[in-house]
């Protein structure tokens, strides 16, 4: 994962922009977290937006907090509407929380476009970015807006190629428009700088891991009651990060007991 951090934050890159295209199982989420944590350490990660498919929202939020101590407020459409009602009409709702994680299906809505075009970010992450490559779609429109409004851009996809060279070129264009020539061909030197693509048989992976791949086990989920100390921490986090006013519900869900 250190390779990804070094490449993304290489001084030669005026803006940290990269496509993490490692195959499944090589730790793209860890690479994302390490890059973001280093940006924060350098004072370049105050405002961060993570955009993911809905089904991985909670997992991504948990990984960022548990592994890198990076708290993100998870927002859905209801939560965003609550934020809009709690701030003056002239204030951009996406300026309220400095670090947010929102599903792409929520964020691509027409109702948020004007706000997103006016909001700057230090870093934007788009997970499973192969879903934003089709020109003219709502997903692609959202990605294009965010790419223009951020300094650092991290795209992550285990399948950046879908058989159509134009799809891969679109990912590169989001990172660096000048890397796609007028004839549609790519600047190969720029691609090498912008893309990390490894699989289990890559030399770097083989040198580190060898053949020591463990078989994946089926996860077993058990419901465990929290301790009083854990309840206290959860309450403090909820009051500090989620509640905007007394008796307000968390932006992403209902009030406790409702």
Residue ranges and their predicted role:
Residues 1-21:
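Conserved pre-motif I regulatory segment
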Residues 3-6, 28-31, 37-141, 145-148, ...:
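SF2 helicase/translocase NTPase motor core
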Residues 14-18, 46, 98, 151-152:
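Pre-Walker A (Motif I) flank of P-loop NTPase domains
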Residues 15-35:
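Walker A/P-loop
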Residues 23, 53, 159:
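P-loop (Walker A) phosphate-binding loop of NTP-binding proteins
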Residues 25, 127, 157:
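Conserved G/P- and acidic residue-centered "switch" motifs that form tight phosphate/ATP-binding loops
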Residues 89-90, 96, 100-121, 136-151, ...:
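Inter-lobe coupling linker of SF2 helicases/translocases
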């Amino acid at each position: 994962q250190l390779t990804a951090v070094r490449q993304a934050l290489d001084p030669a890159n005026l803006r940290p922009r990269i496509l993490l295209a490692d195959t499944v199982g090589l730790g793209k989420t860890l690479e994302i977290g390490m890059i973001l944590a280093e940006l924060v350490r350098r004072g370049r990660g105050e405002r961060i937006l993570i955009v993911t498919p809905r089904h991985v929202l909670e997992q991504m939020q948990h990984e960022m907090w548990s592994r890198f101590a990076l708290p993100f407020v998870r927002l859905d459409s209801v939560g965003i509407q609550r934020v809009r009602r709690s701030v003056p009409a002239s204030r951009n709702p996406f300026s309220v929380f400095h670090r947010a994680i929102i599903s792409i299906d929520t964020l691509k809505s027409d109702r948020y476009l004007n706000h997103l075009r006016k909001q700057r970010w230090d870093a934007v992450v788009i997970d499973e970015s192969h879903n934003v490559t089709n020109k003219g779609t709502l997903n692609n429109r959202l990605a294009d807006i965010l790419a223009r409004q951020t300094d650092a851009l991290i795209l992550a996809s285990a399948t950046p190629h879908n058989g159509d060279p134009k799809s891969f070129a679109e990912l590169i264009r989001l990172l660096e428009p000048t890397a796609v020539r007028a004839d549609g061909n790519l600047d190969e030197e720029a691609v090498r700088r912008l893309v990390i693509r490894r699989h289990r048989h890559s030399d770097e992976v083989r040198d580190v891991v060898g053949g020591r791949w463990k078989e994946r086990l089926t996860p077993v989920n058990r419901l465990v009651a929290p301790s009083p100390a854990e309840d206290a921490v959860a309450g403090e986090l909820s009051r500090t990060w989620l509640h905007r006013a007394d008796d307000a519900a968390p932006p992403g869900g209902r009030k406790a007991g409702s």
